[in-house]
Amino acid sequence: MPAVRIKICGITRVEDALAAAAAGADAIGLVFYAKSPRAVDIHRAREIVRALPPFVTSVGLFVNASRCELGEILDAVPLDLLQFHGDERAEDCEGHRRPYLKALRVKPGDDIVGRAAAYPGAAGILLDTYVEGVPGGTGAAFDWSLVPTDLGKPLVLAGGLTPDNVGRAVEQVKPYAVDVSGGVEASKGIKDAARVRAFVDAVRSRRRDET
């Protein structure tokens, strides 16, 4: 199994972004959704992205943002990848000069494969926990047995991951990448560097155990 990529989402401070990169994270996520306790404004986001070392991917998370809002942010912040967490259609996600991930919130009975197929231009599909009225960052895991064996695209697993359970998640789901936010925080929006390192180590050690 190839090395699983790791994204630390909900970054709000330069020091947390640098700590994530130093721990070995492949990507950091910035939340552009005002209702989130982890939201960042354009000025802070630009500061964080500019501080990143080479080869660490910057991801912008959006929830039902307008094209005007997206354009304003993308003109100011050099994001590498977009992540759509709302009710966006495929056409809403495309045409922004960036590759994108589409997040799908999982609940029993979902046709996940069919829903994913509605986004043929997506670079990958992120699966997160369904909580009514909450687009993400719930801190709750979902039933990993619901994850299809093949989505036809890279699978990013999110939802309630922590240093304690991510090894089991990687072993069971075999995702392309894992995405964590609350599971490595000291408080909402503030990362705990020790928990970030523990999370990365748990993913990497699982990979080593399989080689």
Swiss-Prot record:
Entries under InterPro entries matching the protein: Aldolase_TIM, PRAI_dom, RibuloseP-bd_barrel, TrpF_fam
EC top class, in one word? Answer: isomerase
Gene3D superfamilies recorded: Aldolase class I (3.20.20.70)
One Pfam annotation, family name? Answer: PRAI
**Is the keyword Isomerase in the record?**
yes
- Record EC number: 5.3.1.24
Keywords from UniProt, A to Z, are: Amino-acid biosynthesis, Aromatic amino acid biosynthesis, Isomerase, Tryptophan biosynthesis
Query: What's a single GO BP term from this record?
Result: L-tryptophan biosynthetic process
This protein's record includes keyword Isomerase:
yes
User: Quick one: which pathway?
Assistant: Amino-acid biosynthesis; L-tryptophan biosynthesis; L-tryptophan from chorismate: step 3/5
Example GO molecular function term?
A: phosphoribosylanthranilate isomerase activity
Q: Which reaction does it catalyse?
A: N-(5-phospho-beta-D-ribosyl)anthranilate = 1-(2-carboxyphenylamino)-1-deoxy-D-ribulose 5-phosphate
Q: What does the sequence similarity comment in the record state about its family? A: Belongs to the TrpF family.
Report the PANTHER family cross-referenced here: N-(5'-PHOSPHORIBOSYL)ANTHRANILATE ISOMERASE (PTHR42894:SF1)
**Which NCBIfam families does this entry report, sorted A to Z?**
PRK01222.1-4, PRK01222.1-6
- HAMAP family reported in the protein's UniProt record: PRAI (MF_00135)
What is the official name of this protein in its record? N-(5'-phosphoribosyl)anthranilate isomerase
Q: Report the source organism.
A: Pseudomonas aeruginosa (strain LESB58)
Lineage of origin: Bacteria, Pseudomonadati, Pseudomonadota, Gammaproteobacteria, Pseudomonadales
The protein's gene is named trpF
